[in-house]
Amino acid sequence: VIPIVAPFIDISVADGVLAAMDQLRGDRVTLVLHTLGGCVTACVLISNALRQFRESVAVVPYMAISGGTLIALNASRLEMGRYAALSAVDPMIMGQRVRHLAELDSDKSVAALAREYEVAMQGYLRDTLRAHVPEARL
């Protein structure tokens, strides 16, 4: 069992989780998530590593918000507490939601970067959801 109990998942948290995964014997892993999310890169690294296990379980006793939701959805099984919560995966750049930055008229380069980022994240999420949701519902 690998706990991810952190208000913010950053690269150092991801490094610790990946190191713990490397130490596991076998092809099973269980993550316990209690987080508000964090750095998209860190969450994607953990998600990609989670996909490498034949059997993976994400346990969410209370909350796995944004990037925590992304990680939880990449497990082959999700177990949630009675009052647990997931949320939208809502990436941010410079403290602003990507979807809002993509609409900026004042800074075209930031808006273009945000649109590119948003398209990439939507593709990643679509691939993640394909494992759990029939194609027709995506």
Q: What does each model-found stretch correspond to?
A:
Residues 1-138:
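Terminal-region recognition feature
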